[in-house]
UniProtKB/Swiss-Prot annotation:
Domain 2Fe-2S ferredoxin-type: 4-87
Keyword Transcription regulation on entry: no
Name assigned to this protein: Uncharacterized ferredoxin-like protein bbp_166
Cofactor, how bound (note): Binds 1 [2Fe-2S] cluster.
InterPro entries assigned: 2Fe-2S_ferredoxin-like_sf, 2Fe-2S_ferredoxin-type, 2Fe2S_fd_BS, Beta-grasp_dom_sf
Positions of [2Fe-2S] cluster binding: C39, C44, C47, C75
MF annotations from Gene Ontology: 2 iron, 2 sulfur cluster binding; metal ion binding
Keyword Calcium: no
Keywords: 2Fe-2S, Electron transport, Iron, Iron-sulfur, Metal-binding, Transport
Signal sequence, renumbered to the chain: none
């Protein structure tokens, strides 16, 4: 499988990963990027970040917290390609 990347705009960090069925927050945490998070199920919205480019998927849980356009919830979304985010 081809490696994809997560580019984090506000700290110029690039994370390379092999697409798997794991949440975005898990990938970030494995790379020492810790976000505020409480419920890890999309209810509270504390992990909300901006998706500037790319796509995320909500397979098992769709977030219930209110959000603005381009807001995503890394605790319950997965990715399958490269993305650009702002934390």
């Amino acid at each position: 499988m081809i490696n994809s990347k997560i580019i984090i705009l506000n700290n110029n960090k690039v994370i390379y990963y092999k697409p798997q069925n794991i949440t975005l927050i898990s990938i970030l945490e494995k790379n020492d990027i810790i976000l505020d998070s409480q419920c890890k199920q999309g209810y509270c919205g504390s992990c909300r970040i901006k998706l500037l480019k790319g796509h995320v998927y909500y397979k098992n849980i769709f977030p219930l917290a209110s959000c603005k356009p381009k807001d995503i919830f890394p605790c319950c979304c997965t990715i399958s390609g490269s993305i650009l985010i702002k934390i």
